[in-house]
Regions:
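Extracytoplasmic/secretory-pathway proteins
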Residues: 22-216, 221-524
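Gram-negative bacterial Sec-dependent N-terminal signal peptides
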Residues: 1-26
Length: 524
């Protein structure tokens, strides 16, 4: 008898704690995704690379970021690192970053007094190299830099030219409803001089950067076709690195402007596949106008990986299930499958009724309460059987990049379908390939808890004990100890309270039913 009372006391105190958290979550302001933490048990970050995160299922434009605002800063880290390596021993990292980036803080008003003068100083150093005459820039930097060093000179001269192109390529740091007029760089002589430097260089580091600078200058010129001509003439000799794929993205953009949509989409898919930093950009830019454009783009693919990349973006806009089927046939190890699988599972979750209520039939009709059995029966019909079959097939084969993703996904869907025994088996199978990360461990534990609680149709002293440890973890330990904002446990927390409340109500224990009955649905 004491054990039962202790169990009840523990459950009650935990429920009260969670009720307080529920009020906080319901009333707090903040940036959270309508299709995120509060509507899902399946955390996509567990399974897909960070570069895909804006493409996770979202109620907004892009998951977690809303809009893509990194157009000016996306490659700052790469640029600083590359030049720091080139200038190692010649220029300290702080100085390199100063000249390359300047002040990275967005400025919303004019503040000439505090404006960093890095661009003016680069121009002054360029004038010094050209005239050999001292000026303010050499007076400031002459003692800090060896201006006679060849690498220092190369750095300054490159930045001088790059900053000229930045006058048209760098956008403002604010968002506007008004359409932005595209700027062009019309100094044909300077563009040609950049290309001429590229042609004369032998140093691979500098040659690679002047190649990209030429592409960038041609892209922002009033004769963009010359960018494509230059790319076609030189691409075979260019290293297939980030700069190459940035250049290829320019070619894709020009083709789009020329209304060559199939070519544009084919090229964007290549960039999506090979350059993670540009995934959000290429996904946004990928726009087949009709089925013919899509078919032509597919026909351009030279191999299965290129076809898989096309389907990977197509699945973002259209049908994740179809895209998964196609990619799995083409390349089972494709990492693109991971993010598409999370989108598919998250979309299936959205159809599940966690409120234990049915909407009223007429206007102003109150929702009708459901029993646990009625709620389970309804939800079983909402899970797409063809999606379950597809994920089960891939899980059984075990030949993807991340087998645990498919094992956990099918286990979760089996829980929703009421197939608890097979869900247990697949969770056990997932453990064999599960990475030893906090997020992966928490994800598996959470879904096992959902499965274990779902097994309970009637509460007994015996089956209460099977969930006590996980309830303590979910209601008390996680809110107290988990400092991140990625792991999706709030939905399971709210659902489990509603589930237990209904079980206690059906048992005739109305005190416990009332304690567990408070959920986020009470505040909406």
């Amino acid at each position: 008898m004491k054990k039962i009372l202790l169990s009840r006391l523990f459950l009650a105190s935990s429920a009260v704690l969670l009720s307080a958290f529920g009020i906080i979550y319901a009333c707090a302001d903040g940036d959270w995704d309508y299709l995120g933490s509060y509507n899902s048990n399946f955390t996509p970050e567990t399974f897909a690379d960070k570069s895909y995160s804006p493409l996770f299922l979202s109620g907004g434009i892009f998951y977690g970021i809303g809009f893509d605002t990194q157009h000016n800063s996306r490659f700052n880290k790469n640029i600083k690192s590359d030049w720091a390596d080139y200038l190692k021993g010649k220029v300290d990292t702080t100085t390199v970053n100063y000249f390359l980036i300047g002040d990275e803080k967005p400025r919303y008003y004019s503040d000439d007094k505090n404006t960093i003068k890095n661009k003016e100083e680069i121009e002054g150093l360029h004038v010094y190299y050209k005239t050999k005459k001292e000026n303010k820039s050499t007076q400031k930097w002459g003692k800090k830099l060896n201006l006679k060093d060849e690498k220092v000179k190369n750095f300054v001269e490159f930045l001088y030219l790059a900053q000229k192109i930045e006058t048209v390529s760098i956008g403002e740091d604010y968002w506007s409803y008004d359409p932005v007029v595209a700027k062009t760089f019309d100094d044909a002589k300077m563009i040609q001089s950049i290309e001429n430097v590229y042609n004369t260089l032998s140093d691979p580091f500098l040659k690679n950067r002047y190649w990209f600078l030429t592409m960038k200058a041609r892209f922002y010129s009033n004769d963009k076709q010359k960018a494509i001509d230059f790319f076609n003439k030189t691409e075979s000799s260019v290293a297939k690195n980030t700069l190459y794929y940035r250049g290829l993205a320019y070619v894709a953009g020009i083709n789009y402007k020329q209304k060559k949509f199939a070519t544009s989409n084919y090229l964007y898919a290549q960039v999506f596949d090979k350059c993670p930093e540009l995934r959000v950009v290429t996904a946004y830019s990928f726009k087949p106008k009709n089925q013919s454009d899509w078919t032509k783009a597919l026909a351009m693919a030279k191999n299965n990986k290129e076809k898989a990349a096309l389907w990977a973006i197509h699945g973002y806009y259209k049908d994740e299930k179809q895209a998964i089927e196609k990619i799995y046939e083409l390349d089972p190890k494709s990492e693109h499958l991971n993010y598409l699988a999370t989108r598919l599972v998250n979309s299936l979750e959205q159809k599940i009724n966690n409120s234990f209520q049915i909407d009223g039939q007429g206007e102003n009709q109150k929702p009708k309460p459901q029993t646990v059995a009625e709620n389970k029966a309804e939800n079983k019909t909402k899970v797409d059987n063809s999606a379950v079959d597809l994920i089960a097939k891939i899980s059984a084969a075990g030949n993807t990049e991340k087998p645990y993703l498919w094992d956990i996904a099918i286990g979760y869907l089996q829980s929703l379908k009421g197939d608890y025994a097979n869900a247990d088996k697949n969770y056990t199978k997932a453990e064999k390939t599960l990475p030893k990360t906090e997020l992966a461990g928490m994800q598996l534990r959470l879904l096992r808890f959902v499965n274990n609680l779902s097994k309970i149709d009637k509460l007994t002293d015996k089956n209460e004990k099977t969930i006590l440890a996980d309830l303590n973890w979910l209601y008390y330990e996680l809110p107290k100890n988990y400092k991140g904002d990625t792991f999706r446990y709030q939905n399971a927390s709210s659902w489990s309270r509603s589930y237990l409340s209904n079980l206690y109500k059906e048992k005739g224990d109305f005190v416990m039913a009332e304690i567990f009955g408070e959920s986020r649905y009470s505040y909406w």
